[in-house]
Amino acid sequence: MYFPLEEPDAYGDFVRRLNRFAGIAVIGGREVKIHIHDPGRLQELLFPGVKIWARRRVGGKTEYYLTAVELEEELVLVDSSLHNKVAAWLVESGVIFQGYRVAKKEPAFGKGRFDLLLESPTGGRALVEVKGVTLEAGRRALFPDAPTARGARHMEELARATAEGYEAYVLFLVFRKRAASFSPNWDMDRKFAESLLRAHNAGVGVRAVKLEMFKWGLRYVGELPVDLTPPF
């Protein structure tokens, strides 16, 4: 079962990152600006000389849109704009949350929004926050790869949602081939990790699924075990 992806129309070599959303790459023998649609640091992926996949971009300040990084043994999706679509596809395909349906995308809750509102088989409501994971160390997928105050707030809001009668979940989409489990990145962002643990203790479900990228799409591999235990 595959989530279809647009095939890249350009390949190149990454040179350097300019800021959070832009970088320089060599494509077709010349240096060009590329748009990076991922707020993470991506230091383990975007290093000088790494092979990249991209699509030509019409309009805007950059010529190309980064879609993936090609490592020795894997392709890694680097496009957070697809995360919600992938999560909705997993639900609608019956791969996860069997019997649930997507009732709404980007539902409002409190002062913000979550990614998905699901309807359960019994008519209940379930809020889902989706996070993409591209960092892997020692076969563990780790999130985040940079401090995220916004992510911590999301966990607090999910906990509040359970108190108001919702089911609530955080779904981590893992895009690393070698990952065999998922853990919060305590060393990078202890505040987020603690907020995730508190949310789980308040009844928020924490799930992680692995997806493998190919040129034509993403393949669902399976669900990963989740370990929220502090390493100290």
Swiss-Prot record:
**Listed Gene3D superfamilies:** 2.40.50.580, 3.40.1350.60
InterPro entries from the xrefs? SfsA, SfsA_C, SfsA_N
Q: Which Pfam families match?
A: SfsA (PF03749), SfsA_N (PF17746)
Protein name, please?
A: Sugar fermentation stimulation protein homolog
Family, according to the entry, reads as follows:
Belongs to the SfsA family.
Chain's gene name: sfsA
Q: Which domain of life is it from?
A: Archaea
A single GO molecular-function term is: DNA binding
